[in-house]
From Swiss-Prot:
It comes from Enterococcus faecalis (strain ATCC 700802 / V583). Coiled coil: none annotated. Disulfide bonds: none annotated. Signal peptide: none annotated. Belongs to the UPF0297 family. It comes from the Bacteria. This is UPF0297 protein EF_1202. Transmembrane segments: none annotated.
Amino acid sequence: MGFTDETVRFDFDDNRKKAISETLETVYRALEEKGYNPINQIVGYLLSGDPAYIPRYQDARNLIRRHERDEIMEELTKYYLANHGIDIK
């Protein structure tokens, strides 16, 4: 792969979205594998900030704590609205 003379744009927002998405997928699977209701547990964590809602299994607790709760909620809200026909600016 060669280099180009054109400026490459780095979009931090896209990388953040991807990281949050991957984290939520991992956490969801870990909760499911442990027999919990993943939605209830994630909502409990987001509302309370108490990491005890998320198991240490598959490093899920450490992964989710890498993101600010408000950033996770922001991405979830944007995703929901965008998938319901709302143009997010």
